[in-house]
């Protein structure tokens, strides 16, 4: 079908919106990295991004929604590991991807502390991020059960918590680097914990 003159303004508007959103999210990420979530303001984002405050408020109600948008944007790249025919490798792929995101230290630390103190953010985080990751781990666990690598009664939620929990604990409390060796240790521990008996 041929493009009409009426299609042009819509395309321009869509492109402008995408550029504005990219500038806003980029500025937000930079400001959180520099100042933490506590130092994030809509005024600061507007100044850094060059986008009007009214445009920002049209999309995000407040600083908390903007901070959550960063977390959603950061985790968007995570998706169900492909079927590799090897449950351990699929879980390792998931943990390595999660590690890459969590290693954005200052940003993640700031966002996690905000989530811990604000129930509405915690709820949104669970609904828009955790539940998605849980579904991805469930796909891997289901394949592992079908292969006989994991028992049929494997608790997906517990497996997910065991895969991701050590990453946050190390980042926030104990301090050693998150690296491939640690990812392997986490996955091996989970595989042993759920090994068919």
Q: What is each residue range found by the language model?
A:
Residues 1-48, 54, 65:
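Basic, helix-initiating cap at the start of DNA-binding domains
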Residues 1-11, 89, 93, 100, ...:
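C-terminal peripheral helix-coil segments that are non-catalytic and often amphipathic
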Residues 78-106, 159:
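Hydrophobic alpha-helical connector segments
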Residues 24, 39, 62-67, 77-78, ...:
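Short amphipathic alpha-helical segment with a characteristic S/N-K-E followed by hydrophobic residues
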Residues 110, 120-146, 156-158:
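Amphipathic alpha-helical packing segments from all-alpha helical-bundle domains
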Residues 49, 59-60:
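Core residues of bacterial helix-turn-helix
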């Amino acid at each position: 079908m041929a493009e009409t003159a009426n299609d042009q303004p819509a395309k321009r508007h869509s492109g402008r919106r995408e550029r504005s959103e990219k500038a806003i999210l980029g500025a937000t990420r930079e400001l959180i990295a520099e100042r933490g979530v506590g130092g994030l303001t809509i005024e600061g984002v507007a100044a850094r991004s060059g986008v009007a405050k009214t445009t920002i408020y049209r999309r995000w109600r407040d600083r908390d929604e903007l901070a959550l948008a960063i977390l959603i944007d950061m985790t968007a790249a995570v998706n169900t590991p492909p079927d590799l025919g090897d449950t351990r490798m699929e879980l390792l792929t998931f943990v390595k991807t999660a590690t890459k995101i969590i290693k954005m230290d200052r940003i993640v630390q700031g966002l996690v502390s905000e989530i811990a103190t604000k129930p509405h953010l915690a709820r949104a985080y669970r609904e828009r991020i955790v539940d998605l990751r849980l579904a991805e781990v469930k796909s891997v666990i289901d394949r592992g059960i079908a292969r006989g690598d994991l028992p049929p009664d494997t608790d997906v939620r517990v497996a997910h918590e065991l895969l991701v929990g050590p990453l946050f604990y190390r980042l926030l409390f104990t301090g050693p680097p998150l690296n491939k060796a640690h990812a392997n240790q986490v996955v091996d521990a989970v595989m042993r914990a759920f090994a068919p008996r």
